[in-house]
Amino acid sequence: HTLVARLTNHSDPVHKVTIIPRGQALGYTLQLPLEDKFLTSKSELLDKLCILLAGRAAEEIVFGEITSGASDDLNKTMAYARKMVVELGMSEKLGPIALPNGDDGEVFLGRDLSRHKTYSEELARTIDEEILDLIKSSYARAKEIISSHRVAFDKLVETLLAKEVVDAKEIDEILGLKPVAKEDASPKPAEQEPV
């Protein structure tokens, strides 16, 4: 995740990566935004999909085998891709539409049986195709980034195995990148209006 997160243009800066397990995660990449965000662009969401799929892509590239380790990332990927297509109007084929998400607050087990479809089978098929296209293209992009930066990837892995935690500065050194510019964190005086 770290390599892809650092090499995509619309992702939050990577602050550190660790291989120390926490909870059900075998490690994690910590990304923090430079500022509070209220809107997310399509480019940012596409980068997020790519980053989420980077772990699975790395398994395939390095080991020629995939594991169950990416299951949470795959669930998140599907949720983001579906939201992009169905709720945010970010589908090329469907255009700027938002469809009902079907969450009407019913909590009993058979709720899916009682729902009435609000769109046709043809539209449902197009939605599925668009979601799969987003996921497949993001996966291919993640594989391409990792493959084209394999030497840096291997160096990052080697460093992580030796140190277990690597911070942003060292990540940038390994990748041969300039550090992400941090905004001035000092408080700015409020502008005063004339009274």
What are these regions, as identified by a protein language model?
Residues 2-195:
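Soluble catalytic regions of large protease machineries
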